[in-house]
Amino acid sequence: MSLDPTPPRSDDGRLLWSRSEELTGFEALMWRVEADPRMRSTVVIVETLDLEPDWDRFVAATEWASRVVPRFRERIVTPFLGAGTPHWALDPDFDLHYHLRRLRLPEGAGTPGLFTLAEQIAMTPLDPSRPLWEATLVGGLPDGGAALVFKLSHVLSDGMGLAQLLAGLHSRSREPMTDKPQPPPPSGPPATLSHEVVRQVRSDLGLVGGAARSLLGVASSLVRPDRAVRDAVAYVVSARRVLSPPPAPPLPALAHRSPSWRFRTLDVPFAELRAAGKSVGGSVNDAYVAGLLGAFRRYSERRGEPLPPDRLMPVTLPVSIRREEHEPGGNHFAPARLSAPVGIADPAARVVDVRRRMKIALGEPALESVEIVSAWLARLPGAVVAGFGGGATKSNDLQASNIPGLRDDAFLAGAKIVRSYPFAPLPGCAAMIAMVTHGDTCCVAANLDAASFTDLAGFEQDLADGFAEVLALGRSRG
């Protein structure tokens, strides 16, 4: 999957990316559910580099990025007296020195040591009083290589938005660009009580206005009351499906949960994955999900839980609901809930069944109802919201995401980006697995709950085997 165009720039050279002062309802909900430490929305992107960048050049590049993308200098402000919704505001005490770190792996640690370090960085909470990101340059990888471990909050953006961001920030040349725009540091008035009151009133009016527009839509449909009733009933039934966990029971082998994360990766040739899906009338995403299900079936069976062919498992797949009017960045996705065919051993039949079920999930009339509900839930106390959010996600065995990536060579402070692994947060599920296409390689990044997966080496092999059997479809039928 290729990336959308690079975000446009303003006249002064800033990226037009995630500029709204307001959090969406879903973003506010993600922020509030962090009252439960197990619901933290930390994202870690690990980019491996062919060489170690010059530190001063890396610092200068990051300082430039903080001027081009003002969100890097903004923090989330909790409303006065705790009433109302949180919002973005410039951090008057922004300190780049705090956000940048430099580490070197011990001799012989290699790539496994890098991902162990990334796990520890991911499990360390971001400081909520500062802008929600940190960047760690890691040296000491084999053959003179290095890595960037970029940690940020999911509240900043979804996967598509982050892909747009990196497309706008990464260079296409190893040499320094002397003609890139140099906007001044962002500035703005300090937050005051009067500004806060006006902002909250505007936010509340927007929420009420949205509800009113929905009611007007219903009223106008009464010109055809028979159709209106059918559509209303269909929407309510659809919303119940969208907002409820999939009806499939979780796998017993993955029953336990903890706040501990473990990272595993897999590289898959993009052309082969696409050919595998196409060979049975499916897409890259269908083949990707089928490969994951094959891994879960193998893992469950090795743990003493053989699965019958009709066994299903609960899976959620975030799908983009971005529209043309949406500015790049931010969170614009909805959860497609799937009772996924984990018991099907034949990879071809599994891909076909995944495609059938995905079409049904994506065709839900109320797919975007999560955003409507989130806007109201975000007004509740954090502890209440955390309980609701955890209950809605902990029954999932797997959340899986497929993110577009950069197809051309990209560079960071003179170092070529070799691979990019997006480790998304674990919101109560056993596994969150994301895939980004970098060049001609699909980089699969698995964030696994350490209590759910007690045999990590075994699952790593299961993941490789699950994709291998799917990739074989493209070779045997090509």
Regions found by a protein language model. Give the residues of each.
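Soluble acyl-CoA-dependent acyltransferase catalytic core bearing the H(X)4D motif
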Residues: 2-27, 35-37, 42-429, 433-464, ...
